Structure formats: structure tokens, C-alpha cells
């Protein structure tokens, strides 16, 4: 099994909010950037999107905040594929501190889009092949309870 696609970053001062930790919107930015980097390196670079008149949209996402990050903390995001079909990929990403503490998780559903029609369209074959290969060869994990979690207040 292959190690997951991973992006490493350090918390910059601009990411900090009035509570002294990373602002919630910045978690979503770094998760989105990690998935973009995954896509760029697996067959959907900006140049490939332009040449194919094709792109990929986020159609649903959810982030769970489990621990804090403060300025200068180093963290990494590991990207997993939970599921896919010919025009959708369900990503699950895990953000951890260098000591292994899980900081946040992010679940995102991405949908392939034809720029010509502005409608959903199957993935280009070379990208789908990369998704299938990644999924088949990724490290197997016990999916965290945050996967598929429904926001609710228990009564």
C-alpha cells in the first residue's frame, strides 16, 4: 500500500483569528488547496483543464475541528479517496500536527464539469485512471467517525 498524498505546511500569522488560533475559514482553504494539489499531480493541472475545456467543482464539503493550531505550528494533510465513480470523487482528508494529533478532518465531494456545457461530465480517462489507481493502492485506514457525520443536536 502506498502512503497517502500529503501536503505539509506551517501556520502563518495571517491565518490566526481573534481567538489566537487558526480561523475556521483558513482550515477550509488549506484543505481545498491540498485537494487542488492532488488533482494537479494526478492529471488535472490547470493546463490540462484548459486544454480539455474541463474542470472539477466542489459540490459538498464538511469540516470537523478537533484540536487547535496556533502560529508557527507545523501540520500535514493526508488525502484519501473514500469513493468515486466516472464523474465524482469523494475525498476524505485528515489534518494532523507533527506529533500525530488529529487537528481536523474534511470531507469533500468533487464533480467533473464540462466548461463547454457547464454541466457534469465524466472525468477525462487519464484522470479517472489516476483516481482508480490511487484508490486501489492507497493505505487502508479505519475511517474516522467524522466521515459521513450529520450535524445534529441530540435530544
Task: Set out the residue ranges of the language-model regions.
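Short hydrophobic alpha-helix segments
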Residues: 106-108, 124
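Generic short beta-strand
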Residues: 13, 92-94, 110
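Hydrophobic beta-sheet segments that form the core/acyl-binding groove
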Residues: 61-98
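Hydrophobic core residues within well-ordered beta-strands of beta-rich domains
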Residues: 5, 57-59, 75, 89, ...
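Conserved GNAT-family N-acetyltransferase fold
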Residues: 31, 93, 106
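Hot-dog-fold acyl-thioester-processing enzymes
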Residues: 1-58, 114-155
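Residue-level signal for glycine
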Residues: 100-102
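Long amphipathic alpha-helical scaffold regions
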Residues: 97, 109-111, 115
Amino acid at each position: 500500500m502506498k502512503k497517502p498524498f500529503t501536503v505539509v505546511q506551517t501556520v502563518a500569522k495571517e491565518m490566526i483569528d481573534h481567538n489566537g488560533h487558526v480561523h475556521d475559514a483558513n482550515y477550509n482553504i488549506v484543505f481545498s488547496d491540498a485537494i487542488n494539489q492532488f488533482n494537479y499531480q494526478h492529471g488535472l493541472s490547470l493546463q490540462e483543464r484548459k486544454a480539455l475545456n474541463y474542470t472539477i467543482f466542489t459540490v459538498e464539503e464538511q469540516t470537523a475541528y478537533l484540536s487547535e493550531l496556533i502560529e508557527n505550528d507545523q501540520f500535514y494533510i493526508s488525502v484519501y479517496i473514500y469513493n468515486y465513480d466516472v464523474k465524482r470523487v469523494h475525498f476524505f482528508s485528515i489534518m494532523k500536527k507533527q506529533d500525530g494529533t488529529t487537528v481536523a478532518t474534511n470531507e469533500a465531494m468533487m464533480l467533473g464539469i464540462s466548461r463547454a456545457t457547464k454541466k457534469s461530465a465524466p472525468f477525462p480517462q487519464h484522470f479517472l485512471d489516476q483516481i482508480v489507481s490511487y484508490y486501489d493502492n492507497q493505505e487502508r485506514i479505519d475511517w474516522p467517525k467524522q466521515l459521513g457525520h450529520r450535524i445534529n443536536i441530540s435530544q
